[in-house]
Amino acid sequence: METAHAAAAPLGARERRDIVSGEVMDEARLIRFVPGPGGVVTPDLARKLPGRGLWVAADRKSLDAAAQRNQFSRAAKAKLVVPPDLSGLVTALLKKRLLAGLGLARRAGDLTSGFEKVSAAISSGRCAWMIEAADGAEDGRRKLLNLARRQSSPPRLFGAANAEELGLALGLENVIHTAFLAGRAAERWGSDVLRFSGFSPLVPESWCEEPSAADGTHVAPRAAYE
């Protein structure tokens, strides 16, 4: 069962240079920043804000290094102001973007929710992402995980949002089990999950301790983007 670091996510069309390591990599693995009003370093997750882009690898260690080593000012050749806890800000913005993406996908018909519907999507091979509420009951999740692990191409697993957050995003109540159906929308959403995974675990640590089968084996989700 994958979560977030083994199957490659869809990559962007262009490459950029990480201002911390100097490595050239795909845009999908980077976060873009621009100098905002007052020279404040501003995250541009959609890559649409005007101004020269300052690109940093999408992980907490790289972003913290950029902030602490004055890399933004050096790259911009101008004095910039780094907001306090920039990594925390980016994490929150990425999560907000992921939840908004789920809402858009539901309106487009690319999501299905509820245990039976998710089970059917997994069995049919149409489930690209199995989205489970972080605070959902173990029993239903375990059954779906066991079903997913039996598929020739298991869906990836996302469990970084609770039932209330999922419900607000989808306009539903008590959202515990959701399937993101395979297609271009799931691929685009996966690109944002890739970036988010550099800042936050995609499943609660406690899930890895849950028994997932009659023989007592445990849920040990693999990362989906290594």
Which residues fall in each region the model found?
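C-terminal functional extensions of proteins
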Residues: 180-226
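Short basic, glycine-rich beta-strand/loop surfaces that mediate nucleic-acid
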Residues: 152-197
